[in-house]
């Protein structure tokens, strides 16, 4: 629902989900509905929002932690973004479980980012983000933490050609990941040429759709037909 000042409220419910999503530590019990809501409020040159989500998790697929089919889980999120001289945003998420699962009991995520388009040639867009992830058996505990800094740059060479790069550094593991991508748009075909490097052991934070999960360095060619 949208108010006249552009504030809005979202409510949702989900059912039948089982697999992990994003940074989920545990799978979802698909027999128990999920539900949540979000309140978003406009601020000067931006907006801020508060979110809540509830689900029942299941630890039966992980052998080294206590086994529970139904683990009530409460998720709290706070995020905001502003357009000033640069684009600025932050995202925080706190996950509280009612069962003791050791270091997987509670999670905390803190992310800050910024983006800016430089007036170079056709315009080069640069995005910087830093993410801290904490796992602990104490709520808001920071004993087991991981820190990753990411940068993404994109430059349009022409209307049909673009070059971009994704770079990640894991401060905890001390390793570096990158993926440089050139793509050309034909009438019905999109062609991608990718050069990448991944460390031999890639953490879950560094695994995503933008950075492939093959270890080592390599070149990949991908052709996509659009119909």
Model-derived regions: residue spans:
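Signature for the C-terminal beta-barrel architecture of outer-membrane proteins
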Residues: 1-141
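Membrane-embedded beta-strand positions of outer-membrane beta-barrel proteins
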Residues: 11, 39, 50, 90-92, ...
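Short active-site-adjacent structural elements
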Residues: 19-20, 59, 173-177, 200-204
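Hydrophobic, lipid-facing positions within transmembrane beta-strands of outer-membrane proteins
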Residues: 33-37, 74-78, 86, 108-113, ...
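Outer-membrane beta-barrel "beta-signal"
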Residues: 41, 184-190, 213-227
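C-terminal structural cap/anchor segments
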Residues: 119-183
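C-terminal closing repeat unit and adjoining cap/tail of repeat-based domains
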Residues: 182-202
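Low-complexity, intrinsically disordered Gly/Pro/Thr-rich segments
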Residues: 196, 201-211, 217-220
């Amino acid at each position: 629902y949208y108010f006249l000042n552009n504030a809005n409220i979202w409510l949702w419910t989900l059912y039948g989900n089982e697999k992990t999503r994003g940074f989920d530590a545990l799978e979802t019990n698909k027999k128990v509905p999920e539900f949540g809501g979000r309140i978003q409020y406009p601020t000067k040159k931006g907006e801020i929002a508060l979110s809540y989500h509830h689900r029942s998790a299941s630890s039966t697929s992980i052998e080294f932690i206590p086994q529970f089919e139904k683990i009530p889980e409460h998720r709290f999120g706070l995020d905001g973004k502003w357009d000033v001289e640069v684009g600025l945003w932050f995202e925080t998420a706190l996950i509280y479980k009612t069962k003791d699962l050791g270091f997987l009991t509670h999670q905390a995520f803190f992310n800050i980012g910024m983006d800016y388009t430089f007036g170079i040639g056709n315009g080069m867009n640069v995005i910087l983000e830093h993410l801290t992830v904490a796992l602990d058996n104490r709520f808001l505990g920071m004993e087991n933490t991981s820190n990753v800094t990411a940068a993404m740059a994109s430059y349009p060479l022409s209307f049909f050609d673009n070059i971009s790069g994704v770079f990640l550094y894991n401060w905890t593991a001390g390793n570096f990941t990158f993926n440089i991508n050139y793509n050309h748009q034909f009438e019905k075909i999109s062609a991608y040429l990718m050069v990448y490097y991944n460390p031999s052991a890639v953490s879950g934070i560094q695994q995503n759709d933008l950075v492939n999960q093959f270890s080592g360095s390599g070149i990949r060619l991908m052709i996509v037909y659009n119909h």
